[in-house]
Structure formats: structure tokens, C-alpha cells
Amino acid sequence: MRITDFDALRLQVSQPELDAYRARNTPELDDLTAYLSGEDNLLDAQAIAAHLFATEPVDVFLSHAHADHDAVVALAVTLERLGLRVFVDACVWGDVYALLLKVDQARAGIPGEPGVFNYTRATRNAANMYMILSVALQRMIDQSELLLFLDSSAVRVQDYVEGEAYIGSPWIFAELMFAQMVARRPRLAGIGTENLSEALARNEAGATAPMVRYRLPESSHTMPSATLKRLISSATFAATLATRFRLRSSSYDFLDQFYRELPLSAAERELLGWADEAR
């Protein structure tokens, strides 16, 4: 699901709320030995994924560009207020780079040259780490009910081909491609991500690294950010009334209203358990 003009979405979230969300969702790094196993000090993919990513399914997975991080966390906080479980992996990536640096220092360092690494070993370390994270992200997407691709000017690169849209993030590209292929399952009685390559795109001198452009995968549905904001405002008001008058309220109330704004197919309605409802 693509949210267009995400740049225009302005949500009222206080700085303490933003800081609290990041604190709750930023895992602390353990000692490197916790992720190594065997005599050859092999990276333990399962241990890394289990530590950095939630094990419980989430309602909403936020897929986004690194530059939109603050606005994405504000959206996550707002959706959490409505009772939804939200995954924003931007809070994880900083630890990933710190962990990768520790791995390089332990397995790719050149004796007598601090901060200098063996290129081949460091490249393999990065490839292994990114593969581990890619699989973990796919698992999170598979376990979520809804993936929201937050499309903004920060996501895209200059488009030189008329009628074609491109993005500069390999991670967003991978997430959206996987979301197209993942099996859709009936609702049980959710999508983000920070762009890894963007976070490393500037070296110490401030130069921008070469960027690859990726054709933007199509989304099953599209919604303007203004519509999303209207739905959030309506759901927030309804939740306030429910609390005041002790009425029944569910996190699915917002998702149901969200889905009703979309031109759902018969198959999608059936997955939501709405097949028997009057059209």
C-alpha cells in the first residue's frame, strides 16, 4: 500500500514521545561473542535476527527513506495511540552498523593499522550481515497485516525516463518486491524502513557515494497522505469518545476504516472476512 505525498503529512507528536518510541525500539548491542559460534567464529544469523527484530507479529510495517525518519516515527507513535503494533526498522539500523564495525574489527582488521580493514573480509562481512537483515525484514513483512510504503521526495531519484518512476533505495526496492510476492492470508482474530545505503552514502569528507536507481515496484493500492491524516483524526476522536464513555474499542477499528477507503477486490474482502457483507 503506497501513501503518496508523505512529505505533506504533519502529525502532532511531542519530542518526549518520539524519544520514548526510539528508546523502546532500539535494542542494545550485546558483546560480539554473543553472535559468534563455533571454532571459526561464524556469525550466528538466528541470534542476530532475534536480537535486533521483534519476534511477535506486528499490525503495520512502515517502509520509508532515511531522510523521513522523524516523520515516520511520528506516524508510528500516532498509530500506536490507536492500539496498533508498528514496526519501524530505522531504530535498528544504527545498531546494525555498530555491530558490523565490531565484526570488522574482530575479523577484518589489519594488525598495526587501527581503522584499516582487509577489503575482501570486510566486504564478505557486510554481505553476510545484509543478507541476514534482508531475511529478517522479509519475515517481519510476512508477519504484518499491512505494509505502508511512505512515498516522498526523499525516496525518489531524478527520473530521466518519461512515464517511469525510480527509487534510490535497494532496501525499499527489496521490501516492495517481496511484498508483491508474499502470500496473502486471512486476517487473524503489519512496514519501514530506513535506507541502509543512504545511511552510508556519505563518507567522512561529506562526499556522496554513487547511487543505483531501481524501478519503483507497483503497489496494490494508493492513498494520498491527506486521506490517511483524515482517517487518523477520525479514529483518534472515536478512541477518545470510547475511553470517555467506556465503550468497546479495538485496534482493528482504524484498520477497518482504512481498508474501507480502498477499492478492494473480492479476494481482498474475503481475506478480511467481509465476503458476506453487502456491497
Task: Place the predicted regions along the sequence by residue.
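Acidic, metal/cofactor-coordinating or nucleic-acid-engaging core segments within structured domains
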Residues: 119-122, 135, 142, 181-197
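Conserved TIR/SEFIR loop-to-helix hotspot centered on a Trp-containing motif
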Residues: 128-129, 155-185
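Glycine-rich, N-terminal phosphate-binding loop of Rossmann-like dinucleotide-binding domains
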Residues: 151
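Conserved N-terminal substructure of TIR/SEFIR domains
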Residues: 1-144, 263-279
